[in-house]
Amino acid sequence: MNSRERLITTMNFKEPDRVPFDMGSTQVTGINEQAYRRLRSAYGLPEKEVVYSDQIQGLALPDDDFIEALGIDIRGLFPLNAHNWNVKVTDGGKYWLYLDEWGITHRKPKENGLYFSIYQEPLKNEKLSPDSIKNHPWPNFKDPQRIAGLKELADLYHSKNYGVVMKDPFAGIFEMSQRICGMDYLLMLMASEPDLAGLLFDKMVELKIDFFSSALPVLADSVDVIALMDDYGTQVSQLISPRMFRNQIKPRWKEVFDCIKQYAPNAKRFFHSCGNVRPLIPDFIEIGVQILNPIHVKATGMDPYQLKKDYGDQLVFWGGGVDTQGILPMGTPEEVREDVKRNLDALMPGGGYVFNTVHNIQADVPTENLVAMIETFKEYGVY
């Protein structure tokens, strides 16, 4: 069974020859460039200049030899976006600064900095108004340059029998709105001025539909999975109440998913939402989510055995292979092995599972733990 057959089989809730393996197909299933360099060396691969899938997060785009050496099954398509396109860094004293296409300023410490963090939002607090939303210079997601060459790349990946995932070019309705006006301010608006918050959410929907309605007529037949993201969970609960999600966010996501269904009916719909999103899972299913990521196994309510029991016939689980908060960075190789074995035992029966870490692999993860994860997966991820 080849990689694409393996992915399609598991997404149809059947058991392939082994669990499909993802590392790096999206900007939420990736690996930090420092960890990537060390892992290449551990597998005897030569040094190479790192190409980034996401410069803001410092994520490496895995090279062909790495994909082959580790037995990775899935390749990613990355439309041009603020994290990988025209990233021009300027000197800001102790920081590197980057002004992106949304008008958001990011900064990274020059000394030991690993990531760019948001420093200034363009419509922060009182700057947000109906007029400022209307007049802000929003990015153009109908620009064909955003997907230039992606169909040819996807077809190349398919010719080599890989599964192909295309990522949404910007963060989710809720999360991208936070980046525009500030998280604290948006949360207050949702409670005190939901109509104003709604105008910003509607703009995000408009931009997403601009992208998918122009990109999918070109790419729909060349992708197996379309990946979208919006974080609603914390370690123990949700960032907003389920009622607020259902009233203000859910109907807007349904518009986006309906657009994707219209233009790419055969592609599976992947949705990333960190933390404890257990109360929202039925809502995700209702709007059209078919694949849930990351399966935050150490968050309250996200026990993989219970999730598989309750939703294993409705959702493909993608991720959750090893805890990236504690065990992978701070545990022993044996603890990593046991965690991988447990999560495979919970999630792989009956298909409907793709192996990946709970979230991106960070720079401080010991290489021996990554090797333990990969080799344990290879040993126990077989049907």
List PLM regions with ranges.
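Short, charge-rich binding segments
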Residues: D65-A69, N86-L99, L153-S159
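Extended, Lys/Arg-enriched charged tracts that mediate electrostatic binding to polyanionic substrates
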Residues: G76-K88, G93, K142-R146
